[in-house]
Structure formats: C-alpha cells, structure tokens
Amino acid sequence: MSDKKAVILLSGGLDSATVVAMARAEGYACYSMSFDYGQRHRAELQAAERVARQLGVVEHKVVGLNLNGIGGSALTDSSIAVPETPGEGIPVTYVPARNTVFLSLALGWAEVLGARDIFIGVNAVDYSGYPDCRPEFVEAFERMANLATKAGVEGQGFAIRAPLQQMSKGEIIQAGMRLGVDYALTVSCYQADDDGRACGKCDSCRLRAAGFAAAGVPDATRYF
C-alpha cells in the first residue's frame, strides 16, 4: 500500500466516484468518507459503499450527522419540494454550510491518518450554483485548514484538491471511463428511490444526463 494517503469525500455520485479514481491513479492510498446527514436521497450511501469497493479504497467511513435537524434545504426537509425545472439564483437544494461541515470532518480524519491531501468533487462549470462549490471556497478552506490544525501550524500543510473544478460533466465522465469507473454503481438523483433509481427530472439528473450525452457514452442511470 502506498505511503501517500488521501481522504476523499465520497457521496456516491458521479463526480465523487471519478475523484476517487483520479486519486488512485495518482498513487494515493484512498480513504473515503461519506455522510448520513438526513438526506432524502439515502440511496447514495449504498452507492458510496459500492464505489468504494469497486475502486479499492483502504477504508470507507460513514459519519452520522443530523443536518435535517437544521433544515433549510429540499434535501433535508421533506416539506420543501425538489424543483423539477431550473430556477433563478441558488436553488432550494443547497444545504446550508454542507461542504464546510464535510470538509472539516475530512480534515480531522486526515490529520489523524497523517494524510496531507483531501479530495472533493466540486465543480464550477456544470453545477447548480452552490456557493460552496466555487474555487474561492476551496482556496479559503485550505487556508483555514492550515491555520486551524496542529499539523498545519507545525508545517505539515494540507492541500484541498478539487480536480473537477473546471471540467464539464462530459469531460468528467470521459475521464472516469478511462480510469475504470463503473457509473452504473453511482446515484446522483436528489430523490432517488430505495433501489437507487432516478427521477430524471431534478437538476442533478438533468446535469448527469447531459453529461453522458456530451461524453458520447450510454447513460448508465436507472430511472423509475
């Protein structure tokens, strides 16, 4: 096993699966972290486990959080409908501070493991407009990580890696195919059923379908 370790945020979706494959291709021993945070699309947790097995991660950790106790998002509050048509501004599927919370916990695990690199599959090209997916956020979090940790102040700095940041969804899928990602294992839908079948209507489904079309690859998604 490689001495070079990385912690990777793995939702079970298309983007994060590709990031695991990219990190593995760079020679990292991969440690993946998923979150059971009260999301309505819980099928993504089973997808994350499947992806972790397929791509040979060293350890896959699922952390429980109660973000539905805070609410404020269609993904954590069942009284808020998931939009089926694009809207203006930041959509109601934005989960307040989600990537800040997730990266903070990944940072803690990375410090324990002695990993210096943390990978996240955020994208600022084909995305829903979430503020915590932008390059400015990633750069700011990296600065904070190196101010707020024992490892950081002792000169063992962390890097927050976002390799998909400037890639289109089609480019991401093409890269993942070259690296052996089985996209049939992944779940992207915001309201997937218990079997992981997708609605085909939400923003995440639309972006995913457009990505497969742009990549010229058969869509591996199962729909209900």
Curated annotation (Swiss-Prot):
Pathway: Purine metabolism; 7-cyano-7-deazaguanine biosynthesis. Signal peptide: none annotated. InterPro entries: QueC, Rossmann-like_a/b/a_fold. ATP binds at residues 10-20. Gene3D superfamilies: HUPs. Its cofactor is Zn(2+). GO terms for molecular function: ATP binding; ligase activity, forming carbon-nitrogen bonds; zinc ion binding. Keywords: ATP-binding, Ligase, Metal-binding, Nucleotide-binding, Queuosine biosynthesis, Zinc. Zn(2+) binds at residues 189, 199, 202, 205. Pfam families: QueC. It catalyses: 7-carboxy-7-deazaguanine + NH4(+) + ATP = 7-cyano-7-deazaguanine + ADP + phosphate + H2O + H(+). CDD domains: QueC-like. Binds 1 zinc ion per subunit. GO terms for biological process: queuosine biosynthetic process. Its EC number is 6.3.4.20. It is an enzyme of class 6 (ligase). The keyword Zinc applies. The keyword Transferase does not apply. Belongs to the QueC family. Catalyzes the ATP-dependent conversion of 7-carboxy-7-deazaguanine (CDG) to 7-cyano-7-deazaguanine (preQ(0)). This is 7-cyano-7-deazaguanine synthase.
